[in-house]
Amino acid sequence: KADLFLSIHADGAVSSSAHGVETFITTAAGFDSSNHYGKGGDQSVVLNNRYNAANAMLGYAVQSNLLKMSGRSDRGVRRARFAVIKKAPCPAALVECGFLTNPEEERLLRTEAYRSRVAQGIVNGVRAYRTLVSRATR
């Protein structure tokens, strides 16, 4: 059984000026999503809702460490009902590491150095999450 699930992406937007990194976690039951894909009344309970507190700890730990290592703008931790995270049988987050539609971020995403910093930020975030979980379960 998995302890956590991360889905790692490079984002895209209509505007080439969109930039930064963001982390999505499952929307809590009874609330609208903070992304435009989930608005409009989908307030259903999903499999991953039972991990709401753990999802929040994971999302914030990954986002804060990704920011430190990437040096990019903070788009925040947001809530969404993306299928890949809402069906996860464990704490889960979807990480957006930059925008391929932004010329500067596309250039960065093509470099091994930036991808290594992003990877290290995510690893540091997972380690921070594990520390938080171990403290919470003492």
Regions found by a protein language model. Give the residues of each.
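Active-site-proximal helix/loop segments of hydrolytic enzymes
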Residues: 1-138
